Amino acid sequence: MMSSSSSEIDVVKTRIPTYDEDDNTVLYAYETKPEFVNKEPNIVSDVSCNTEEQQKTVNDVLIHCQVIYDAMQNLDKKIDVIRRKVSKIQRFYVKSLWTNRKRYGYKKYSYRLAKKLKLKKMKKNEVYESFSYPESYSPTLPVSRCENNSPSNFPRPSFCMEEYRRAEPEEDPILSRTPSPVHPSDFSEHNYQPYYASDGATYGSSSGTCRGNPRADGIHNTYSTDHASAAPPSVARSPFENDRYIEEGSITKHPSTWSVEAVVLFLKQTDPLALCPLIDLFRSHEIDGKALLLLTSDVLLKHLGVKLGTAVKLCYYIDRLKQGKCFEN
């Protein structure tokens, strides 16, 4: 029998004769055609080849997809690392901005401040150049002075005058002249009290030293050093402990030749109420006659800390001193 799945076109039907005549059965033999037998294996082999190629192609595609997926994973990891670093840099930058934050308009004000400081420095340099002399102002040798124990309340200037070198035991010509002896009645009239300085020399002072009249005839502290050496050391000290003895008439010499003590005596005699507070300041800066003539109101106010009224008065007296009118009646 031919199977139901087979087709009559593909087989050859052959009748088989029977030996029993009484039987009506007919037998047929079916054979496959040779063309069908030869063609069927080729079709199967082609189909198998196609499936293998398709499977290989699919495998290649999957492999490439896996490589792409791995590369994307690596890129994601690198991007995460870069983001963390960028965020860390941003936090550090913001923190530095808050810690080093400058006030509003800092550049503008800093420029003005720098310019102001530069101008101030230039002014100081100019003042220093005008007052920095290589030698002493006075042509005479400086006089060794006793140190004042009372501290000065005046501020020191920004510039420093060169300190005098201590000379050998030679005296100022103004101070070395021997005065004429004084009558004993002068001591009772002017309440003279001799005192001893630190170098052993004895000096004198009178209560009438600071007077409004600048003439030299108002000076009465003309006590001889020979007479003063005989005074006992137990005598009370004078209120003007740092004053040097200056002979009568020496203050009337040219102001550029004055020593420091001559300048001090000039302050006492010119205007004791206004200028006596400047004595310690002048002694601390060792202002002699030449330095006195160079003083201006700006130097007195800015660098020596003198008050305005006192500076105006002193400048007025210095101008009169330059004109030679200070000792006129």
From Swiss-Prot:
The modification Phosphoserine is found at residues 138, 238. Transmembrane segments: none annotated. It is found in: Nucleus. It holds the Pfam family SAM_1. Residues 258-325 form the SAM domain. One of its GO terms (cellular component) is nucleus. It comes from the Eukaryota. Its main location: nucleus. SUPFAM superfamilies: SAM/Pointed domain. Keywords: Nucleus, Phosphoprotein, Repressor, Transcription, Transcription regulation. The keyword Repressor applies. Putative Polycomb group (PcG) protein. PcG proteins act by forming multiprotein complexes, which are required to maintain the transcriptionally repressive state of homeotic genes throughout development. May be involved in spermatogenesis during sexual maturation. Belongs to the SCM family. PANTHER family: BEN DOMAIN-CONTAINING PROTEIN 2, SAM DOMAIN-CONTAINING PROTEIN. This is Sex comb on midleg-like protein 1. It comes from Hoolock hoolock.
